[in-house]
């Protein structure tokens, strides 16, 4: 293990002891924002320090085995112990290197998932509904909480646009690679000739700001309109102007929320989504230059980029960024995304390791 890496791990060990002390104090929950930051940091570095403790134990075992080699009667045993200790050290060092990769500061945040129907008309809207169900089923498997923020249903079912909030530890780290264009190939229910149609939707996964104040929004830059909420087909669901449309004038970002009968709640939801969209826009602008110099296979989050194809006649899903094809489409659409997400995370980590190697 490199000295620089060991030094970093020693620092984390010291920091974990400090966090344990801070979190054991009686007034630790007096400042909830600070408490969240401390618990988040503790959860992040705890497993790293535990791995490092195992590496140090393996190192101690290696030194003990080396001392035993001098005793002829213990040599065979010592050689076995030495091999085992070095194998453990090598495995743990590789795992620690991955664990020490630069962290996305948004990884542990809650998220907003925005799905928009694209080319394909009604079939695209139906597929948007299928994608929403896929993510909701995945969230259910993770025991995450889901809240509908905004929906624009289509006449035949599905959605022209839908936004949900998913709350759960690590939600962004697991679903951030879903941003982009999703293409579906299947025979629509309305197709009488049995022809396969191709439709598309775009997905945007945005980290939630810890609080709206985290993103600077000047009230003077907002235009807030109220209007009468309506359901699919234009039927009025109430007779008051409870729906809210918030426009951020500098960026042109518009958010509508009408799912609640309370205008106040709709406005609050709209501002949360707006803060997330502005944060997302700032994040992508900040990383645009970096992306131009080092083209990343995944993680660009470009909504115009086609990332995946779902072919129903063949029962397959292909992720074009990593050339992964899985013939388990039914399970995937039911929220079984673990294999896919693990492959995307693994590729992302490999890219980070490669970029660190280039920098050295």
UniProtKB/Swiss-Prot annotation:
Keywords: Cytoplasm, Methylation, Protein biosynthesis
InterPro entries found in the cross-reference section: PCRF, Pep_chain_release_fac_I, Pep_chain_release_fac_I_sf, Prokaryotic/Mito_RF, RF-1
Post-translational modification: Methylated by PrmC. Methylation increases the termination efficiency of RF1.
Cellular component terms (Gene Ontology): cytoplasm
Gene3D superfamilies per the UniProt record, alphabetical: 3.30.160.20, 3.30.70.1660, 6.10.140.1950
Alphabetized GO MF terms: translation release factor activity, codon specific
Pfam families: PCRF, RF-1
Main localization of the protein described in the UniProt heading: cytoplasm
Residue positions, PTM N5-methylglutamine: 235
Transmembrane annotation, as ranges: none
Entry superkingdom: Bacteria
Compartments in which it is found: Cytoplasm
Family statement: Belongs to the prokaryotic/mitochondrial release factor family.
Function of the molecule: Peptide chain release factor 1 directs the termination of translation in response to the peptide chain termination codons UAG and UAA.
Official protein name in the record: Peptide chain release factor 1
Protein's organism: Burkholderia pseudomallei (strain K96243)
């Amino acid at each position: 293990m490199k000295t620089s890496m060991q030094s970093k791990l020693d620092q984390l060990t010291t920091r974990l002891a400090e966090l344990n002390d801070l979190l054991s104090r009686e007034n630790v929950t007096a400042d909830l924002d600070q408490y969240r930051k401390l618990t988040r940091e503790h959860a992040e570095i705890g497993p790293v320090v535990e791995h490092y403790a195992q590496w140090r134990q393996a190192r101690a075992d290696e030194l003990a085995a080396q001392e035993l080699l001098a005793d002829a009667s213990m040599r065979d045993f010592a050689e076995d112990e030495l091999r085992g200790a070095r194998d453990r050290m090598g495995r743990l060092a590789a795992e620690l290197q991955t664990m020490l990769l630069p962290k996305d500061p948004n990884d542990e945040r809650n998220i907003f998932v925005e799905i928009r129907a694209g080319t394909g008309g009604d079939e695209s809207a139906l597929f948007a509904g299928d994608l929403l169900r896929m993510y909701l089923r995945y969230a259910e498997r993770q025991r995450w909480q889901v809240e509908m923020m905004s929906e624009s249903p289509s006449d035949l079912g599905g959605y022209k646009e839908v936004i949900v909030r998913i709350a759960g530890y690590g939600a962004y780290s697991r679903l951030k690679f879903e941003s982009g264009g999703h293409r579906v190939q299947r025979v629509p229910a309305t197709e009488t000739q049995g022809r396969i149609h191709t439709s598309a939707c775009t997905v945007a996964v945005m980290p939630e700001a810890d609080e709206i104040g985290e993103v600077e929004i000047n009230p003077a830059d907002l235009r807030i309109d109220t209007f009468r909420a309506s359901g699919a087909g234009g039927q009025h669901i109430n007779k008051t102007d409870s729906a809210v449309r918030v426009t951020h004038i500098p960026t042109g970002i518009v958010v509508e929320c009408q799912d609640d009968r309370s205008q106040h709640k709709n406005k609050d939801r709209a501002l949360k989504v707006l803060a997330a969209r502005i944060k997302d826009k700032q994040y992508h602008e900040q990383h645009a230059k970096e992306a131009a110099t080092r083209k990343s296979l995944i993680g660009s989050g470009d909504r115009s980029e086609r990332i995946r194809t779902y072919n129903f006649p063949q029962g397959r899903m292909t992720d074009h960024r990593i050339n992964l094809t899985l013939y388990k489409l039914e399970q995937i659409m039911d929220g079984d995304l673990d294999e896919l997400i693990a492959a995307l995370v693994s590729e992302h980590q490999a890219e980070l390791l490669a970029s660190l190697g280039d920098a050295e």
